[in-house]
Amino acid sequence: MAQWVLSIPKGRARETEAHRMNLHQRRQLIEIVRQQFRLDWQGIHGVPHWGRVRWNGLAMARVNGAREDVVELFAFLHDSQRFHDGTDREHGARAADYTLELNREVLALDRPGLELLAYAVRHHSDGLLEADITVQTCWDADRLDLGRVGKTPRVEKLCTEEARDPVLLDLAYRRSLKG
């Protein structure tokens, strides 16, 4: 039940060794994203948020079998094309287009993974609930970090059983408040 309390759990994630990002690839991607990022790098939609989304997502993926590579990339890309921290209804679409560009240059995701990632990024702010488990895991990873903007995640707006687990929900919320 609460495997994620001590660390990101190991589980049955759907990915191969070829899909995993190594540290060098992760740093390269983050530097590319940083060079064009328009907001405060340490702000509410910046790298601290991405780190928490990554942790939340990988914790759930290792339990529910979502593709870890897609979940990790989602964390780094979903807010990468925001023009400001307020309402920016098109940032998901811009980030999905950016994701497709990056796949040609850096990401090298397989077609199914790229389709999942682009869909998750494009629709992450739309309030949807129904999708592939990988997409749902991405959305929940982001929603679990709402405390940073003064909101409490609502259980009925979470897609996965893992995100609705009271232990993870509380842990993620407390982490989100620390900014």
Predicted regions and their residues:
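Short coil-to-beta-strand
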Residues: Q25-L29, A66-L73
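Short, Lys/Arg-enriched N-terminal segments with co-localized hydrophobic residues
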Residues: P9-R20
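An active-site-proximal "capping" alpha-helix that borders the catalytic cofactor pocket
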Residues: V53-R54, E90-E105
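Membrane-interface starts of transmembrane alpha-helices
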Residues: D110-E115
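His-Asp-centered metal-binding catalytic motifs of divalent-metal-dependent phosphohydrolases/nucleases
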Residues: E68-G86, H91, A95, A118-S125, ...
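Divalent metal-dependent phosphate-bond-processing catalytic cores, especially two-metal-ion Mg2+/Mn2+ enzymes
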Residues: A18-H24, R38-A66, L77, E105, ...
